[in-house]
Amino acid sequence: ESHRQFDEITDVQDKAIRLVNSFGNDEIDVVINDYPNFWVILLYSVRVAPVQIYFSFGFVYFEFGGVDYLLLPKEASPNNKIKTDIIDYDSYNWLESRFLEGPNSEDDARSTLEVIFYPRARQLEPQARYVIGCYGRFEKINEEYLSVIKAILQREETSVFFVFGPGDFSLATNYFTTTGLQDRVIISGASDPHVLGWAFDVFCEQWPIWSGQSSLEVMAKGIPVVSYMHEDLSLFIEPYLSLRDPELVATSYQEYIDMVIRLLVDKEHYEIKQNSAREISRKVTDLDKRAKNVGTQILLALERKLAYTGSGMGRTEPLHRDVPQALV
């Protein structure tokens, strides 16, 4: 039965019976859930599969009746009060589960940019040749960052700084008005990063807190990301270094400026860094190997459970499959 059919059932007892029967009819081997609502806790408590797993998804370690295993990233450090067995998996962080490239093709996005962005950039004097900038919450932008952007704009007069995202952008607006560079800046509110994200030639990452998801999104589009390693937060940033091009992580403002300028004027270097950005993005989003490893661990757990019970929830056939019959 479809999820919609279950949603339409209002009687709690009837719904519970039909849900349990559905699992039995489908002979589910493994059930995995990452949201322990009433129905999940109920189904796990009466046991609807030989192996029942709670996927913490990198956030909360939640134990409740009927959970055989917690599925956790290896980087997690569960406290010793947790009694449930753990299946771990390799993970950079929770961002890996996000789809970085978005639903738009590059051609579709650029067609939209021809209407909503490029005409505005072409009106600038001198006409914008390069687009640098960032997107994300405006509270991540500070005056130190803006001063470095100012230096880049002054060095490369055909560049324009483009920034968009949610929050109060008055700091950026006032800063560039005061410095007389308001005509070299395009500032906008929240918008679709999978359209406007294609506008950047170089993504100038904010600091001291790096931008996280937005940097990975533009890297998936082949856009180089320049970052600054703030010495006061180096320990906090260090786990994220594998998600950046090490040759584009600056340790001084001047180095940051030089990195951005070189990307703008050195075509060969830019193309190399485009490929590097895509490769890092693929490393983050290619989950096949890690997923297969998790699948193998789950399959072994299922084999142990079936061998222990001798019946596998009433079924006596041996398990000769490469993957569990169903993962829900």
Task: Give the label of every model feature segment.
Residues 1-64:
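Active-site and donor-binding regions of nucleotide-sugar-utilizing enzymes
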Residues 2-12, 187-189, 247-255, 262:
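Short acidic-hydrophobic, aromatic-tinged amphipathic segments that line or gate anion-handling sites
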Residues 10-16, 167-169, 182-197, 210-211:
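Conserved active-site histidine-acidic residue motif and adjacent donor-binding/catalytic loop
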Residues 29-30, 131, 202:
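Structural motif
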Residues 47-112:
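Active-site-proximal region of nucleotide-activated glycan assembly enzymes
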Residues 65, 79-82, 201-202, 206-285:
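Catalytic binding pocket for nucleotide-activated donors in carbohydrate/polymer assembly enzymes
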Residues 88-179, 183-191:
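Conserved catalytic-core segment of nucleotide-activated headgroup transferases in glycan assembly
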Residues 259-328:
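C-terminal amphipathic helix plus adjacent low-complexity
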